[in-house]
Amino acid sequence: MNVLKEVYSTIEKRIQEKPEGSYVVKLTTDDKKTAVNKICEKIGEEAAEVIIAAKDDDKAEIIYESADLIFHTMVLLAKSGITYEELSEEFKKRMK
């Protein structure tokens, strides 16, 4: 299994099972509107950090902050009921 798919599956599982102490659960347990707002705020923060790292030409920081950005985007997608397969299909359409 590819690592991104594995992370996505873990996020989906945590949203569903709500294990105590999970960061994903902390982000997603409010009502949907509040949870989405909270997640979007994190995505905005992480996007800004990627931009700063890129402007500083700091490769390690770009990688680190991009992983945070991708993770929080995956949380948003999963909270919105979008599967990894649906996202993959969209990428496949764009490869033509």
Curated annotation (Swiss-Prot):
One term under GO cellular component: cytoplasm
Pfam families: PRA-PH
Name of protein: Phosphoribosyl-ATP pyrophosphatase
GO biological process: L-histidine biosynthetic process
Subcellular location, principal: cytoplasm
InterPro entries assigned: HisE, PRib-ATP_PPHydrolase-like
Location in or out of the cell: Cytoplasm
NCBIfam families per record: histidine_hisI
Enzyme class: hydrolase
SUPFAM superfamilies associated with the record: all-alpha NTP pyrophosphatases
Organism in which the protein naturally occurs: Methanococcus maripaludis (strain C7 / ATCC BAA-1331)
Coiled coil: none
Catalytic activity: 1-(5-phospho-beta-D-ribosyl)-ATP + H2O = 1-(5-phospho-beta-D-ribosyl)-5'-AMP + diphosphate + H(+)
UniProt cross-references to Gene3D superfamilies, sorted A to Z: MazG-like
